Amino acid sequence: MAIFVGSLQIRIDMPQFTHLHVHTQYSILDGAASIPSLMKRAKEFGMTAVAITDHGNMFGVKEFYDAANAAGLKPILGCEVYVVKNHREKDKDEKAGDHLILLAKNLKGYHNLVKLVSYSWTEGFYYKPRIDKELLRQYHEGLICSSACLGGELPQAIMHDDLEEASRIVEEFKEIFGEDYYLELQLHRSLSGAPDTDTCRHQVEVNKVLHDLAARHGVKLIVTNDVHFTLEEDAPAHDHLICLNTGRDLDDPNRMRYTGQEFFKSPDEMAALFPDDLEALENTMEIADKVEHYTLEHKPLMPDFPLPDDFVIDQAELRRIFLRRFDGQISGLEKKMADADEAKKPSLLHEMEGLRTEKAQAETADDLDAFAAGNERL
């Protein structure tokens, strides 16, 4: 990037940057960025790493992991989780939860992230999958955390002018995550000079306080763009997607709206938005460097059925089990035959004859294991 001082042109090396807050099409409500398009864009921008942080799920993680590795990019696997006071309580005042970004730093962190997201669905689901800070304390190892968007607990405290609570929140997360906790700056301002949206004005005010909190509490800042679609020209399609998924009309004044700036911006575009926060831009690479290379590949996980050392398969009992399976299927067909119209009876009769033939073979088969392996009905 070049700037002019009088007639003198000066070349400035832009800081390196990577996106750490990215929603793919697997963010079911509002994600419109396909994984292949994100990889293509990241390569075009010369990035070396990119993150996935879908809303409350990890459905796209394996596809993202494979695509990033194929593209020569480091996959940073994460999730934007919803945090409530008690994930087991169904409190309508907390049904949405506060947003929080979690990124897996290593394989241990990935496993802990899987546990957190699993618990959010199996124990904490109430309108949305939710966790709480008790779970975060239990499964924080190997995770990097950032304060998220305006929907995060910290930005919400700032927007409500509760700076004492904001300081308490920073200290709480710092106690849990230590140097792996970051404060997240966002600014959805158009570079073309379009008027600021309400969202952008809120972000400006929140960012001012985040700078103060970062200095006061010794926490580093990062810059993100809360990516929801890949290209700037995808904004109208993303807007239509929101309407479809929320059942609202485009002209509904009270519907969910985005700014149109939530696209996968280049490092230069992000630097232009944050000219005074070059260190926060560089800190995204600090996080990328923290993330270790690890594999998701493993052997098939088979259930373990412990058997006593003296266990012997009783061939006679095995044969009885096979025959009971055939008897059950034949009985079911006989009931269908009784209620079927005449047009269907020939096909049912043909199937029943086949089952009786196979039952007769099972009664006389020498190798029941081989017989069962070759029989799709068993």
Locate the predicted segments by residue:
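Phosphodiester-processing cores and adjacent nucleic acid-binding clamps
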Residues: 3-378
